[in-house]
Structures are given as structure tokens and as C-alpha cells.
Amino acid sequence: KDDGVREDRFRSIRTVLSVHNIEYQGRYNPQVLGDLFGLDHGWADDGTILMDGDVNLLKGAILCADAVNAVSPTYANELKTPYFAHRLDGIMRRCGYKLSGVLNGIDIKRYDPATDPHIAANYSVGDMSGKQADKAELQRLTGLRQEPYVPIVGMVSRLVSHKGLDLVCEVLHDMMELPMQLVVLGKGDRK
């Protein structure tokens, strides 16, 4: 988004960048500027797209976008911290004025336990009687011992570090010493 390069008809177009996983930044040798974009290295010397001597396409996109959103308000805040931002926390803080989080999640009407036909028994805030049957069915399906008084901790997520799996792994041994059961559902990296 360089006003010296864009045609007049494109100058009024506004852009929104959605950050799903800041770990994937599009880092390349600066030679890519010529190979892919037909630009000389001098074009990037203003610091917009270079980071640690490499082209960083995500950094450039964040700086040039009119608005940046993340997949949740929590993730938007996490992106301003070193732990989650994978070295782009300074850029994210600098662009905080245009950063927001858009919450995604389940459809609470479709997956309402009071009416869901796909669970063992229905329940609601006013009538919790079916909840124990659902817990027993989950324990049966996952091969856990059916222990009615032991809490089940559930995690449904992509199984990658930026979703917190590394944090769970750090404390997993301690968690398993507690009177609890853990159910994890998701796809992710083989490690």
C-alpha cells in the first residue's frame, strides 16, 4: 500500500487484515521483492516490510492495513505481548489503535443442551438432571473411568502452541495428580 505505486483508482480502497495465527509471518530473503513483486531492495528500506534482514510480509501488512482484527478480543490483547506475538509485539502495540478482536464460537441456539438431539440427555439451568447422564456418556466414549464426582476438564482447539497447548503440556503432569479427568479434542502438529 504505497501511494507512490498504486494507481489513482485504488487509492480510496481500505483494507482489513485478519490475523488468525501470527506465527506464520511470511518471512523471506529480500530477493523475493524482485522475484515476486518486481521491486528493488531500496523499496523496502523504510522499515515497513523488513525485519531482522528478512522480508516479513505480515509485518508489512499489519503496518499498511487500515484495520487489523484477530480471531477474538483475547487474542487481540495477547498479540501485544512477547509470548504470543512471535517478535511482532512492538508492531502490534504500535498498531493497537486499529487492532480489534472478533469473537468466534459456537452457535448457542444450535448447540443448546436443553434441546440438542445429539446428546444422551437434555438439561438446562433450571433442570440439571440430564447432565450426569451426558457426563457418563462422555466418559464412556473417551474410555475414561465413570466417576460421577470427578470433574472433567475439556479443551476443544487446534492443537498448536499459540492456542495454549504448550502451556497445558507444561502442567499436564501436575494436572493429572489432581482428582480430575482431561478430554482434548482437535487437530494439530504431530509433536
Features from the language model and the residues they span:
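Catalytic cores of nucleotide-sugar-dependent glycosyltransferases that transfer UDP/GDP/TDP-activated
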Residues: 1-191
